[in-house]
Amino acid sequence: MYEKFDLKKVEKGIIRGYLWHVENPDKVVCIVHGIGEYGGRFDRVAKEFNRENIAVLALDLRGHGDSIEKKGHCAPRREVLEDVSALLEYARQKYPGRRIVLYGHSMGGNITLDYRAGGRLNDRPCGYIISAPWIRLVRPVPKPLYALVKLMAKIAPQMTISSSVDERILGNPLTVKPYSENPMVHNRISALCAVDGFEIGLGLEDGSHEDNGKAAKIPTIIMHGSADRICSVEGSRRIAKRLVEKGDAVEYVEWEGLYHEIHNGNDSSTGEEVIAKMVQWVKAL
């Protein structure tokens, strides 16, 4: 079971952290969760890492779980990246000398790719796991609606709308559990958070949101389920292809028939094969 801690104190409150501790770990994994969820939802995944002597940390992003901000307001992106940096620094202080991997799922995958690409922060990890990243959506937002959201991001950035996440298309019901009944989970996203995600996703895909070359040699694995009905698998295919073609150390794995939460599988899988792949990938670094 995890223990909670105060990762970072800011003017409005705190950023909550989670720790799945093991003594003298071989490696450390830091998790960035997706929209509407919270760090503790990765308990099942973290325990599998722990079994292989890998310590795990996570955070509640702004607007999520026990952290500050209105529900769904995971913005501005600059501050979100600073929170991720704080998580990595906490891991370094807790486990000095250990190799650290940054693992982001869904919106967390978008944020983690942004962190990888930005070149703005010097504390890069030794590897990246990108799970079903928000690069583009399966159902694109209509242009008139997106224009309105962009306007609201400027004049009322904390205004929220429904993220419309249906628990039935996330993964296996036995592992997803009663998603809508969990009080730590919500279905809100703010205008600024949405625009940040869409704009950065497009830039990551076409290369306009590019890095300064420092990330090219850092091992990165991008994984996506072919049956994802939330974040389009095509976005992952395209960004992986682009990065491989320019010589980055990127591996792409597509899981046939798995849903959005690939670590939770689909109706006939609990995602154990995905978790095993991640564990072995981290161990091999």
Task: Go through each PLM region and give its residues.
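Short beta-strand/loop motif that positions the catalytic acidic residue
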Residues: 216, 222-224, 228
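N-terminal cap/lid segment of alpha/beta-hydrolase-fold proteins
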Residues: 1-24
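Conserved alpha/beta-hydrolase
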Residues: 46-70
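Short alpha-helix in the alpha/beta-hydrolase fold that links the catalytic acid
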Residues: 232-243
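Catalytic active-site module of serine/aspartate enzymes centered on a nucleophile-bearing elbow/loop
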Residues: 251-285
